[in-house]
Design a protein with these regions (language model features):
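Glycine-rich ThDP/TPP pyrophosphate-binding loop and its adjacent helix/strand module
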Residues: 110-306
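Cofactor-binding active-site loop characterized by glycine-rich and histidine/acidic residues
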Residues: 24-27, 34-165, 183-189, 194, ...
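A general secondary-structure junction signal
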Residues: 67, 237-239, 319
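Short acidic, gly/pro-rich beta-turn/loop elements at beta-sheet edges
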Residues: 73-75, 181, 245, 314
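Conserved acidic/glycine
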Residues: 1-49, 54, 243, 247, ...
C-alpha cells in the first residue's frame, strides 16, 4: 500500500470527528424526543469506515450494512443534512422521512441501507455483487455486519454461494465485542470470528479496526482480489463502541473501566497524534477543523428542524404505483 499522505490524515481526522459529533448530536436530540424509535450510534468504530472509504472506488463500488448506519452514507457522499432530516422523519430526508434511523438509502451514491433485521443485509450484499458480476461492471460490494449477525443462518448460506460463484464482495464484520448485551465469548466456543471463513475456503483474517491504516491495508487487498474476479474475502474488524447498543441500553454488561481502556486507543485520537507528531497541522489548524465540524453539525440540525414532515399521501406514493388511491377503503385527509 502507498504511503499515507498528509492530506489523508487531515481528511480522516475531519471526517471521523464529524461522524462522532454528528452521532453525539443525534443522541442529544433523541433525549429531547425530536428523533423517535431506535437509535444505534457508531461512536468508536469510525476507523473502519475511514479506512474502507480510502481504498474504495466511490464512482462504482457499493456499500450495505445493518442499522448502525447513519454516518456510512455520509462517507459515500450523501448530504449529511438529508441524513439528519431522515432521522427526524422529515420529507427532505433520504427516504422522505419514512425510513428513519435504521433505513437510510441512496441509490445515487450506491449506499443500499440501513437494514433493521440482523443479518438481513448479507444475502442482499451478495445479490448486488452477483448483479455486478453478471453485467461485468467491475464493481465491488462492501457488506458490513455486526458480530451478532454471524450467528444467523443466512450468513452461512451467503458465504457458501459467494465463494462458489466467486462474487466480487467483501464481507466485513465490525466486531465491537457485544451482540446487543451479549459478549462474543458467550456466543461461540471461540472468539476469532474471522475463522468462520475457513470453512468455505474463503480468504479471511483479523484486522485492527481501531486503526484506519490497518483497515485500509486489509481492504485494499480484498477489493483488488474481488475486482480481479478472484472472489470474496471475509474480514473481522476488531473494534469497539463507546455508547450502548442503542440509546435504551443501560450497559450493565460492561464496566466503565473497560470502556476507558478502549478510549486509550480511540481512532480519532490516534490520527490526531500522527498529525501533530509529524507537523501535518498546528494546534491552531486542528482547532479550526474542530470549529468547522461543530458548525457543520449545527447546520444539519437546523436543516432537519426547519424541514417539513411528509404529507400522508407520501406513504402511499412510496408503496403503490397507481396515483389514484380509490382502491383504498378510507380517504386521505
Amino acid at each position: 500500500m502507498k504511503e499515507i499522505k498528509q492530506e489523508t490524515y487531515l481528511k480522516w481526522y475531519e471526517d471521523m470527528l464529524f461522524w462522532r459529533k454528528f452521532e453525539d448530536k443525534l443522541a442529544s436530540v433523541y433525549i429531547q424526543q425530536k428523533v423517535r424509535g431506535f437509535l444505534h450510534l457508531y461512536n468508536g468504530q469510525e476507523a473502519v469506515l475511514a479506512g474502507a472509504l480510502h481504498v474504495m472506488d466511490l464512482n462504482k463500488d457499493r456499500m450495505i450494512t445493518a442499522y448502525r448506519n447513519h454516518v456510512m452514507p455520509i462517507g459515500m457522499g450523501v448530504d449529511p443534512k438529508r441524513v439528519m432530516a431522515e432521522l427526524y422523519g422529515k420529507v427532505t430526508g433520504t427516504s422522505m422521512g419514512l425510513g428513519g434511523s435504521m433505513h437510510i438509502f441512496s441509490k445515487e451514491h450506491r449506499f443500499h441501507g440501513g437494514h433493521g433485521i440482523v443479518g438481513g443485509q448479507i444475502p442482499l450484499g451478495a445479490g448486488m455483487a452477483f448483479g455486478d458480476k453478471y453485467f461485468n461492471r467491475k464493481a465491488v460490494t462492501l457488506c458490513f455486519m455486526g458480530d451478532g449477525a454471524v450467528r444467523q443462518g443466512s450468513f452461512h448460506e451467503t458465504l457458501n454461494l459467494a465463494m462458489l460463484w466467486k462474487l466480487p464482495v467483501v464481507f466485513i464484520v465490525e466486531n465491537n465485542g457485544y451482540a446487543m448485551g451479549t459478549s462474543v465469548k458467550r456466543t461461540a466456543n471461540h472468539t476469532d470470528i474471522w475463522k468462520l471463513g475457513l470453512g468455505y475456503e474463503m480468504p479471511c483474517g483479523p484486522v485492527d479496526g481501531m486503526n484506519p491504516i490497518k483497515v485500509a491495508e486489509a481492504l485494499e487487498e480484498a477489493i483488488k482480489r474481488a475486482r480481479n474476479e478472484e472472489g470474496p474475502t471475509f474480514l473481522e474488524m476488531k473494534t469497539y463502541r463507546y455508547r450502548g447498543h442503542s440509546m435504551s441500553d443501560a450497559q450493565q454488561y460492561r464496566t466503565k473501566e473497560e470502556v476507558n481502556e478502549y478510549r486509550k486507543i480511540d481512532p480519532i485520537s490516534q490520527v490526531k497524534k500522527v498529525i501533530l507528531e509529524n507537523d501535518f497541522a498546528t494546534d491552531q489548524e486542528i482547532s479550526n477543523i474542530d470549529r468547522i465540524v461543530k458548525s457543520k453539525v449545527l447546520e444539519c440540525e437546523k436543516f432537519a428542524e426547519e424541514s417539513p414532515y411528509p404529507e400522508k399521501k407520501v406513504m402511499y406514493d412510496a408503496v403503490y404505483e397507481e396515483e389514484n388511491y380509490n382502491f383504498i377503503s378510507h380517504k386521505l385527509t
